[in-house]
């Protein structure tokens, strides 16, 4: 998953609402979180210097494994948990947060599909399919994984998509 994007979307919403953010990144991508935290901290220092408005405590990063995530999920002071991961992880988080009447926002393992109907512009559909499946080398949760194609255009679309993928370098 692209760790900065999901954090940035959710953090921006929290800050607009006047809430602070605790980011517990995947233990596989801690440097991304630390770099973002550094940049955000510098922006806060400049904002404070220009306005006098205090910004401390708006963002914290916790580095650790599953135990750190579980502690955040269990803590009633954490009003909302936003988690990205597998469906089994999401089910566990949802149950634990619900047990304390908290809220959660879950982005779980997707299986994204594209539907191609007979009325589709096949050139445009081909470009969309190739970009959706290969645009980020498959390294995002929104990567196209399945095609649902009307049988009347299946052969023509397969030929176009195969040719397009053959052009990738």
What are these regions (language model features)?
Residues 1-45, 101:
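Conserved small-residue-rich beta-alpha loop and adjacent elements
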Residues 42-43, 80, 88-169:
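ALDH superfamily catalytic-core signature
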Residues 11-12, 69, 90, 126:
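Generic hydrophobic/aromatic pocket-lining and core-packing "Φ" positions
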């Amino acid at each position: 998953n692209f760790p900065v994007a999901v954090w940035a979307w959710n953090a921006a919403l929290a800050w607009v609402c006047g809430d602070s953010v605790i980011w517990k990144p995947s233990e596989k991508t801690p440097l991304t979180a630390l770099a973002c935290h550094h940049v955000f901290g510098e922006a806060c220092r400049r904002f404070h210097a220009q306005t006098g408005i205090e910004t401390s405590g708006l963002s914290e990063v916790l580095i650790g494994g599953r135990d750190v995530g579980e502690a955040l999920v269990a803590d009633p002071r954490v009003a909302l948990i936003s988690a990205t991961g597998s469906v089994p992880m999401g089910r566990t988080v949802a149950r634990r947060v619900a047990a304390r009447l908290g809220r959660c926002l879950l982005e779980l393992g997707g299986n994204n599909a594209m539907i191609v109907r007979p009325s589709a512009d096949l050139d445009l559909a081909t470009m969309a399919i190739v970009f959706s499946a290969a645009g980020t080398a498959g390294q995002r949760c929104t990567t196209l994984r399945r095609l649902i194609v009307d049988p009347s255009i299946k052969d023509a679309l397969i030929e176009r998509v195969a040719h397009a993928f053959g052009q990738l370098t």
